[in-house]
Amino acid sequence: MKGKIKLIIIALLTVLLVSGCAKKDDAVKEENEDTKTVAENTETSEKDENKADDEISVVTNIYPSYDWVKEISKDTNVTVKNLTDKGVNLHNYEPTAEDITSIKNANLFVYVGGESDEWAPDAIKESPNVTAINMMEVLKDNIKPEEVIEGMEDEDEDHDHDHDEKDDHDEKDDHDEKDDHDEKDDHDEDEDEHHHHHHDDEVEMDEHVWLSLKNAKLVCNTICENLKKLSPKYADKFDENLKAYVEKLDALDKKYSEELTNQKFDTVLFGDRFPFRYLVDDYNLKYYAAFVGCSQESEASFETIVFLANKVDELGLKSIFTLSDSDHKIAETVKENTKDKTQEIRVLNSLESVTSNDNTSYLEVMEENLESLKAGLN
């Protein structure tokens, strides 16, 4: 009996011993797994942090420069955001608080620098860590003033006409005023003339610089140099990408020169505002248009319509051009006022409303513009 009790006690002790060891092993295993998980999470977090620290953020405000940055930064650590990627035209764009924050958080900000970007300098001042590229400053030797040519509506002249009518009305009212009041009015008139003269002296520069392939090449070089400073380890890749892209720009520039030479017509007639001065000047083309490139006008005067229609008849033009993102109404009205009314309405794309969702590229759009010009000038 004593022997059986002894065996039972030994068996119980053995079970307790094995159970205790198993629990200890499980605890050690669980502790090891927890330690491994913490280590893995820490490593992942460090990798994500390093990736974020290493990433170069670029913000642009028009599709062409967005596309140039994308091309130059292929297979590198650069991310690009375009502020007008929702399809808003550059001339109508107003930055949101989110846009300003994007600029503040960016390493590089590429903007046009023209009349439509009057908000940009203040945004840059609030972003001390961002490097800014003003395209018009880069191209300062190539910048052209907006010009009002024959037949084109001059918004300043319309303003002057209204101002003159007001002066005539004031002059009539002055006949009933006292001499001392006349003296005050004369003083005010002198001031008005001074301010008006100052307004006339202001020259608005044409901001549509991206529509010249030659300008595109210069801006791309500047973008590349700045990316190399921001991310030196990818310098060779930036240079490689730039070289490949510039070759494409040069090839298309050459194609423009060759295919627009010796066309039947050398004049582009535009029933719209005209942002293509850099383009036509590059290839020695003449032009007529309803408005200057930055005009906000949408309806042309009777005189402008008649002038353009008569010019179509005079030159025997077979095509009337307009912007791809316009309603084409002015071009159609010009056509209806020509003698035979058989002209083709053709479009050119100014790239002001193109977005990354349009499944195209700067080069593709410029190629399409060439084809439209060739068809319209034959």
PLM region spans:
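N-terminal secretory signal peptides that target proteins for export/translocation
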Residues: 1-3
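Extracytoplasmic metal-acquisition and chelation regions
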Residues: 6-10, 21-378
